Design a protein with these regions (language model features):
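Active-site and adjacent substrate-binding regions of carbohydrate-active enzymes
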Residues: 2-563, 570-614
């Protein structure tokens, strides 16, 4: 968070002019930089690699890219442990590389968003190093949540709060003199001190009641806006405002989920967080055109609109959580439309860097769920997510997973999302139908969840495996042949999913995404502002209409489609003969098979001949 001395260069390109609130119906492509494209052969994706693939992004048809963290980091949490929010990790590039990327994207009509991680810094951040080096009375400790321990000499943590990554949310500081004598703890006048970390110990939580913390983040926002950034994704947006008054409430009273709807959780979703965002919004809107931010806000649905109002947009993860059923997908659509009604926009998310791949998730049958039990009627989702994590933990052995079915359903789900009003966030590789990689060897795992929850969770590395660009090569085109091995291992058959392979196949998942995103802009974009109307909604079928075009999805069996032009289908359609008008003529009727979606422009009703009354 210390300011880098390099000034922003003058703008060298601007994206195609769009609405001042372009993000409300944009397609935003999430790039996990370390796994996208490696230009310098070090086994880690980099900014120049992304720049080299801008033509691919343009051909895909996205409106913006969102870069996950590319800042200096020890990678204790995939880059979300940030050493300096205003610089670039030298393994990924330089600020000059970043400026070239911005110019290339803008020249292609693509906007750029960057990840901001405000809840915590890394333990290598200059502030935290000073807080440790300065001893128990270091003023920098006020920038974090440092508290005395309990028990003899303060050797026990201040409370029983648990980290989201497993283990205690408190880490003890080992304060000693230069010659190694303890400054705190048993045998000294002062108790041991502990710092709070909601995530990994390498990610100490910042104290957002401190004015220096607030001002520094505003400086960071200005820094990137001045370099041409168009928007920000706010990591863990509900987390900054905290009630640290004692006594600390026991963890049994404050689970991480579900969160209370009254803002009473001491660590998450407190009303005071919106006071912080008010200053951010004022800064972002001082630019012309205005910048915006989208909140990663995993909060109760009733609390989500406040984040959209504060920042511009908030993620709705209901579609990502949904299982493959008409009930679950319909519930997700209802949630997104409710957000749109309140906020004027909504978001649709099928996957991201934190969740098992959609192609894998949708290959599970909830009937095979080992936990079983009656589903929560207020939350008819999450079974496939849970089964996928169990499957990953078992190295892809159990529970049973149908890869072919998963890919088929993921294609159908993508077409549903493309047809809905609002913004679509697309995670890199989902357009290739990439599956989760469940069997990464333990020695190659990077995610702290795998280590802090050993035996329970294997973590998120399986959705972060470097992309395949070519069918062959040392890293399937991720990096040059002869370069370093990719930072995460790619499966042997990864090349079958490669961009080069799919570009040559008009029926590939990549071709479906390209066709779908092109039609989304031309067909569904023309319907923006028009209400979504349900055509059919039951246990087998979801069908809705917007602007004279219908989106039909079958979850069960073959479904006859209405007469009209089929604009796009996730699989080849069947065809049957049906009785025509009057029962004496036959006509062909398109049939939508199970686990498939089609877009149709219905035919105009045919006028029947007037009866002869002479």
């Amino acid at each position: 968070m210390t300011a880098n001395s390099q000034p922003a260069p003058p703008p060298t390109g601007t994206p195609t002019p769009l609405s001042r609130e372009w993000w409300k119906d944009a397609v935003v492509y999430q790039i996990y930089p370390r796994s996208f494209a490696d230009a310098d052969s070090n086994g880690v994706g980099d900014l120049d690699g992304i720049t080299s693939r801008v033509p691919y992004l343009a051909a895909l048809g996205v409106d913006a890219v969102w870069l996950s963290p590319f800042y200096p980091s020890a990678l204790a949490d995939g880059g979300y442990d940030v050493d300096d929010h205003r610089d670039v990790d030298p393994r990924i590039g330089t600020l000059a590389d970043f400026d070239r990327l911005v110019a290339a994207l803008h020249a292609a009509g693509i906007r750029i968003m960057v990840d901001i991680v405000p809840n915590h810094s890394s333990n290598r951040h200059a502030w935290f190093r000073a807080a440790l080096a300065g001893g128990p009375d270091a003023p920098e400790r006020a920038l974090y949540h440092v508290r005395p321990g309990t028990g003899p000499g303060g050797t026990e943590p201040p409370g029983d709060w648990r980290s989201m990554f497993g283990g205690s949310a408190w880490e003890r500081i080992d304060d000693r003199t230069p010659d190694g004598a303890p400054l705190t703890g048993p045998g000294t006048p002062r108790p041991c001190q502990w710092y709070l970390h909601v995530f990994a110990p390498e990610q100490p939580d910042l104290n957002w009641d401190h004015p220096a913390v607030r001002e520094d983040l505003l400086t960071t926002l200005r820094f990137w806006c001045d370099r041409g950034v168009d928007g920000f994704r706010v990591d863990f947006a509900p987390g900054m405002a905290k009630d640290m008054s004692e006594p600390y409430r026991p963890m049994a009273e404050i689970p991480w989920w579900p969160l209370p709807e009254d803002g009473s959780h001491p660590l998450l979703d407190r009303d005071e967080v919106h006071d912080i965002y008010a200053a951010w919004r004022a800064l972002l809107e001082s630019y012309d055109p205005p910048r915006f931010a989208v909140a990663e806000a995993g909060v109760a649905a009733s609390r989500r609109p406040a984040y959209a109002a504060s920042l511009g947009q908030a993620f709705n993860f209901q579609m990502q959580d949904a299982d493959w059923s008409a009930r679950s997908i319909g519930w997700a659509i209802d949630g997104g439309l409710a957000d749109e009604a309140v906020c004027g926009s909504t978001t649709w998310v099928l996957g991201c860097h934190d969740t098992p791949r959609v192609t894998t998730r949708l290959g599970f049958d909830p009937a095979d769920d080992a936990e079983g039990g009656e589903p929560d009627p207020s939350y008819p989702a999450g079974i496939a997510q849970r089964m996928a994590r169990a499957w990953i933990g078992a190295d892809g052995v159990a529970p049973p997973q149908n890869a072919v079915q998963g890919e088929r359903r993921a294609r159908a789900a993508a077409m549903i999302v493309m047809a809905l009003p609002g913004a679509m966030y697309l995670y890199q590789g989902d357009e290739l139908g990439l599956p989760e990689v469940p069997d990464i060897p333990e020695g190659r795992l990077q995610d702290p969840i795998a280590f802090r929850m050993r035996g329970k969770e294997k973590g998120r590395d399986g959705c972060r495996v470097p992309l395949p660009w070519t069918a062959t090569g040392d890293s399937f085109g991720f990096g040059p042949n002869g370069g370093a091995e990719p930072h995460l291992p790619q499966p042997v058959g990864w090349g079958a999913h490669a961009v080069a392979v799919q570009e040559a196949d008009p029926d590939s998942t990549l071709s479906l995404y390209r066709d779908g995103l092109r039609l989304r802009r031309r067909v569904w974009g023309a319907a923006n502002g028009e209400p979504l109307e349900w055509v059919r909604r039951d246990e087998r079928v979801l069908a809705f209409a917007r602007g004279g075009v219908q989106c039909w999805t079958s979850f069960d069996a073959d479904v006859p489609l209405p007469d009209g032009d089929v604009l796009l289908a996730s699989v080849p359609l069947g065809c049957v003969e049906s009785d025509g008008d009057g029962g004496n003529l036959e006509r062909a009727v398109n049939v939508l098979p199970a686990d498939a979606t089609a877009w149709i422009r219905p035919a105009a009703p045919r006028s029947l001949p007037r009866p002869d009354r002479s």
